[in-house]
Amino acid sequence: MKNNNRPIFPFTAIVGQEEMKLALLLNIVDPKIGGVMIMGDRGTGKSTTIRALADLLPEIDIVANDPFNSHPTDIELMSDNVRQLKENGEEISLIQKKVPMIDLPLGATEDRVCGTIDIEKALTEGVKAFEPGLLAQANRGILYVDEVNLLDDHLVDILLDSAASGWNTVEREGISIRHPARFVLVGSGNPEEGELRPQLLDRFGMHAEIRTVKDPTLRVQIVEERSEFDRSPEDFLQEYKLQQEVLRQRIINAQQQLNNVQLNYEIKVKISQVCSELDVDGLRGDIVTNRAAKALAAFEGRDEVTVDDVLRIITLCLRHRLRKDPLEEIDSGQKVEKVFQRIFSNL
């Protein structure tokens, strides 16, 4: 766990990498988008950006002394113990805490991730003795897996299952325990170290590609800002305090606005037409694109999705779902844009 006293580089001070920042923000507005896979060169600020986002987010109300960060009113985000207390009409004390940001280490075992059941205690004392894992700690927060392409496929499957369902189930020797595990899954990796299997890649809601900044003036700006932050973190954070507060409020407003956003039928049909023409397997691409477009409209403070909203997110939602053709020279992102322009040209 990170030390909360250590200053964290502010999200609004991060230069460039707009694609990654947008994908992360939209997943915070609507966690049901299904997470982000960030592929790119080493040293491009992936970890810095994710930590900065977690630090930016408003504090959340959680039930005190609860290992699952249970929500005080939402049953979907509440552990069985807390639900039992509520049903019995008992008083529940609350505390406020930062949105959890959990790092999943590469060598983590399944027990460390999912939690363990003390079988001996369960059999002798008749109680379900459960030791929560990282998924419990990540409930209502962000779970970050660096170099996810080097993680065991079975573990990636478990993470994706929990992220999609919002629950983690642990079964040992006929004893079963279930707890809420609703989190934004963020994976990052370097394409040189190997790709994820297509069926795993497809289950990430969005896929952002980032490159090392080439523009010399931007590079100088990034280096100078980092030096300034390292020299005097307090002054640097003060400088960005207002911008951080404005963005934090935008996120809160977008989360509240999300359910009111409309996506008209014609645009939905066009989105599905793009997916169909690109030969995207299944319907996950259609669903995620619809969700992301609504999240973007809410983030921009609108209650209706525009064609421009779809243009900004469709590549992020579809590029990783295209079948790889080794003979094709066009990049998958450009392919998505090309088909989008043709199908949406008459709207």
UniProtKB/Swiss-Prot annotation:
It catalyses: protoporphyrin IX + Mg(2+) + ATP + H2O = Mg-protoporphyrin IX + ADP + phosphate + 3 H(+). Involved in chlorophyll biosynthesis; introduces a magnesium ion into protoporphyrin IX to yield Mg-protoporphyrin IX. ATP binds at residues 41-48. It is found in: Plastid, Cyanelle. This is Magnesium-chelatase subunit ChlI. Belongs to the Mg-chelatase subunits D/I family. GO terms for biological process: chlorophyll biosynthetic process; photosynthesis. It comes from Cyanophora paradoxa. InterPro entries: AAA+_ATPase, CHLI-like, ChlI/MoxR_AAA_lid, Mg_chelatase_ATPase-isu, Mg_chelatse_chII-like_cat_dom, P-loop_NTPase. The lineage of its organism: Eukaryota, Glaucocystophyceae, Cyanophoraceae, Cyanophora. It comes from the Eukaryota. Pathway: Porphyrin-containing compound metabolism; chlorophyll biosynthesis. PANTHER family: MAGNESIUM-CHELATASE SUBUNIT CHLI, MAGNESIUM-CHELATASE SUBUNIT CHLI-2, CHLOROPLASTIC. Its EC number is 6.6.1.1. Signal peptide: none annotated. Keywords: ATP-binding, Chlorophyll biosynthesis, Cyanelle, Ligase, Nucleotide-binding, Photosynthesis, Plastid. NCBIfam families: BchI-ChlI. GO terms for cellular component: cyanelle. SUPFAM superfamilies: P-loop containing nucleoside triphosphate hydrolases (SSF52540). One of its GO terms (molecular function) is ATP binding. The keyword Transport does not apply.
